[in-house]
Amino acid sequence: MRKFLSKSTDAVLTRPVTSSICLLIFLFVSAFYTTRLSINSNNLELLPPENPSVVITRKVIEMVGGSGFYTVVLKFKDEKGMTSHLVKAFQAKRDGNVDLQKKELDLADAEKRKHLAYYKEREKVLKRSSEKLAELFLADKEFVRFVSYRYNVSFLQDRLPLFLKTEDLSEIRKRVKRKIEEEVERANPFFIKLTDEEYNPDFNDIISKYQRLAKRDIFDEYNISPDKGMLLLLIKPTGSFVDIDFDKRLDQRIQTIVKESHLEKDGVYAGYTGTYKLNQDDYETLIGALKPIGIASFAGIAFLLLLFFRNPLFIAMLLFSLFSGLLITFGITGFFIGELNSITSIIGSILMGLGIDYGIQFLYRFREEFTKKQDLIRSIKDTIYHTGVASLSSALTTTSAFVVLSFSEFRGFSEFGIIATYGTLVIAVTMYAVTAIQITLLLKWFPRLSKVFLLNEAQQTPSRILRKFYSRPGLLATVVVLAVLFLGFFAPKVEFDVNGRNLLVENQESVNLYDEISDRFDISSDPQAIVVNTLEESEAVFDYMNPVPEEISGSVDQVVSLWNFVPPYGQQLANRKILDQISKDMKPVKPAFLKPEQRKYLPKAKVFLSVKPYGYREVPDYFATQFKEIPTSKEKGHIVFLYPKVALWHGGKLLEFFAAVGQLEVPKISRRNLNTILYSTGIAGKGFIEPSKETYSKSEERALLAALNSYTKEKFLSLKILPGTVETILEHRPYKNVAQARSYTFKTSTAGSLMLFANLILIVQKEGFAAFLITLFLVIIVLILFYRAFLPAVLSLIPLLLGILVTVGFMALIGLKLNFMNVLVFPVVIGYGIQNGIYIYYRFREDHDIVRAMAMVGPAVIASTLTTLVGWSALLLADQRGLHSIGKVATIGIAACLLIALTLLPAILELAYRSRKSEESETVPLGLGPEEAEEPTLEAKIPEALPIQPKPRIAKSDVKPKIPLKKKIPKKKSK
């Protein structure tokens, strides 16, 4: 190994100009491939392609251009006070204060009634503004597929009696019949009026239950909130929400249209939210934070270098070496991978903080060697032999964490791990090689500058404070261990924050609007999609989820599909019978009998009474097409939209939601079809059969089974049962019981932003702890290979393991929680934490004096760790709380590892090797063996260096040597 390094160093440094030209050519090529790098903003491609949610999401994107909407929210400036009371009511609801919520809602209602004319006028202005905007949006065919803001609800209004539950329609008949009987009595010339009371039937309690059908108010054409203070325009874009570049252009275009409309002249203002806007804002806050973070990181590193080296020349050399390493890394990435993603785009600042460490270690050791020998090539070689091997060991342990990440299912993490792995090794090599070339050229052209690399006597001599600090290692170790145990006591109390909202920018407008929509409309503005192949399957899914099963009712609000607009056929038949009865009841009523205010309802009553049962083919296209693919789509199928009760930031509830609806196993024969068949047998008599009925009496089950086993295909079709369902019934009969009929199922998967985010959470949860353990295992293997012994490997792990314990304990103490982002810091902290132990152990084995070892390597360890710390702590400048939490955890973790490495590890090394017997009996670490100690070809250059005093082997002493002496243990051993 020594011969290889020696020949390589000679080849590079004896021809520094040629080496520099080769380096510049290599940098030029790297720069060329770096410019070809692009950022792939399609986050969908980062998830496992075979994941069911990803597969279905791709299908939805192909069918309708992506799930979700870009939502434009129109509101007016409320000068009367209703809105302020509503806001307080919504907050009280979130806080669980039911009494305050009711009080504020009542106050809001009172304000509206008090200023009814004002709010009516504001409602009209909102609707006029929506008409104006919708026309402009629809004209932009590049970005907008369609806009949902207003619907022709006459189809639903005219067929309202068929949508009512049969028992509710029966109740309406009772009230109508009572009124008719009263009016008939009043028309009798012999009627005697005994009281002034008059019965006026009120149907609001019944009608209000059906006011919102398929998430729409059937009595108002516009997509407006019940309080009439917010109107939504749901824009279905032509592209996918996971394409960030498309999101940006869409957002810019929509906001330009709104701005040019000058809505503010009418007192209306617009807000923006929805799947597309939320995804864009989250990405932009992440990327927007990188520039100030990068600047702060670079400035902090430069300041620390100036503080430790106090020479701008050293800073310039190290920063050029760092720049070269980064450029080569990105050049390799451009050549082999070709693109960065939203995760790997931040890797530059991380590698910058990591890479500068190796340059600092090189420069500190080179100055020490050059001061002793004043032979340039020999000094560089000795630096590489000793510190270089330690740096290689450090680089391999650091990359262990990244290697583990490279096997992640999430491509964002895996590509991050791959780039960070070779990037760390490339930068480690360039920090040594490029810095060495720069020094060689500098001293070749400006020999007088050699004095700036020499250490003065104070820099070579351990201070009295340092000797005193390490003079009582037992006491020092005891104090540090007690402090660690104190903080470690709190470690089990650390909490995991599943609230994904705490990762976002605080008070972001799009997120706040998302909340407000949920409050005002009592719905989620981010529906998920279930894609099925056939119309029969879409009916079965709708039936399975309507009503929502009790076990998932906490996560799912409602499903919306074509079948929301088609009541169960059995219910339609039962309701038609009741309508016939009402018609019969009304025969005695003549228009002349009715008062003027009653007579105006007569035309609508006639429409209601004449309505006929219908099937899905009669549903207007403006309702039906939203559940089908667009004409140009290669994918065919049917969509059922699922409205959740949770949002992206409800981490725990989100996983419950994913577990409930991520994959569904749905019976092919729906309840509504079974109950339609049962109703057709006549067993209900004058009664009715509930469409969602699941349990049957013995007589009902016998009648249903008889029909299932005997009805012809034509009979089933006459009941509006779809052909595919009929084929399923005929294929599997005869049936022994209803459970058998319901046992034939198919599986579905749910797609959408919630599903994708839930998949990411599951990947992090599954891989996080395993990544930590595997990284720890790889680190131990690397240490054993380099140390050639088990005990020193364990000792070097002390700063790491105790540092993590202190980190977690300190987090619990200050109330900092783990989350889905900062948990990934720990595998990285492993790599950072271990390198301090490596440098200290190597130097201790070389000098055999812990005080001298810490005097020489301590400043380098502190400088390199602080530069790393600056890189990570720059994340504290980010507005996005996820990045902010990463910065906090990394800062605490790296600082804890550094403090323990500077205190506890030296004390333990001194205690463990105090007798020197164990040290001499152990195998010498790689880089310090006999073969590395002898190189006769270099001895000829020794006279050119400063006189070297022979240094006898000494134990710990208070004697301060003026010139650092190189210990030649290997020669002693070779004897």
Regions found by a protein language model. Give the residues of each.
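Solvent-exposed, non-transmembrane loop/terminal regulatory segments of multi-pass membrane proteins
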Residues: T35-H85, A89, G96-A117, K209-Y222, ...
